[in-house]
């Protein structure tokens, strides 16, 4: 009888775990580019708009707690492009029950801006900028397994202006 109770309890816990995985919140990502005309030799601003389900947050890019997973936007850039700066939004405080210090989080909707430098000798044509968005979605009770979402920006680059 004890063995049966143990098996039922173990099965119930695994079912809860599987159920939580199927309900894992997903960030909706919208990549845009601020400039209409993009020329070699200039800077361009990439924008990633992130929308999370209601009552969901992600840790900031600079969490206060060393044990949480920060939100991170990274790139594998083609030759001729350089990331000059990534600007994350200001975080908000989120206090969990029984925690002394609030967590630094990004809530429901936020944007990340990236200043990208284009080499002056970059060939004209379409350029694809691939990125990865790492985040861990959490609600007020638990954090879900971290996810990495692929994102990309496509831009038509014109030749550099000659002086």
Task: State the predicted function of each range.
Residues 19-163:
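Extracellular/lumen-exposed scaffold segments
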Residues 5-15:
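Bacterial N-terminal signal peptides
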